[in-house]
């Protein structure tokens, strides 16, 4: 895993036990999963809008910025659920070289 993701995961874990007023992340943890999920949804929409704008303008700087926000809040969500980002990277590694059609067919039915 990249050093940046490792360092961020460590900071997110450290902030779990911090006072709500000590940091933005600590305040999210204190507000609970629903607030964190709200932020993930908000950042998802902002990323989509930035991508649509970039397709027209050719400037991807906002896409990068919004994707960073989306990844960040997704990592907060994972940490709140007791998961480490390495689990996501492991899942991507598992899928590497696997046809998307095969991977989708192997998922349990809902």
Swiss-Prot record:
NCBIfam families: histidine_hisI (TIGR03188), PRK00400.1-3 (NF001611). Gene3D superfamilies: MazG-like. Belongs to the PRA-PH family. It catalyses: 1-(5-phospho-beta-D-ribosyl)-ATP + H2O = 1-(5-phospho-beta-D-ribosyl)-5'-AMP + diphosphate + H(+). It comes from Pseudomonas fluorescens (strain Pf0-1). PANTHER family: HISTIDINE BIOSYNTHESIS BIFUNCTIONAL PROTEIN, HISTIDINE BIOSYNTHESIS BIFUNCTIONAL PROTEIN HISIE. Pathway: Amino-acid biosynthesis; L-histidine biosynthesis; L-histidine from 5-phospho-alpha-D-ribose 1-diphosphate: step 2/9. The keyword ATP-binding applies. GO terms for molecular function: ATP binding; phosphoribosyl-ATP diphosphatase activity. The lineage of its organism: Bacteria, Pseudomonadati, Pseudomonadota, Gammaproteobacteria, Pseudomonadales. This is Phosphoribosyl-ATP pyrophosphatase. InterPro entries: HisE, PRib-ATP_PPHydrolase-like. It is an enzyme of class 3 (hydrolase). It is found in: Cytoplasm. Keywords: Amino-acid biosynthesis, ATP-binding, Cytoplasm, Histidine biosynthesis, Hydrolase, Nucleotide-binding. GO terms for biological process: L-histidine biosynthetic process. Its EC number is 3.6.1.31.
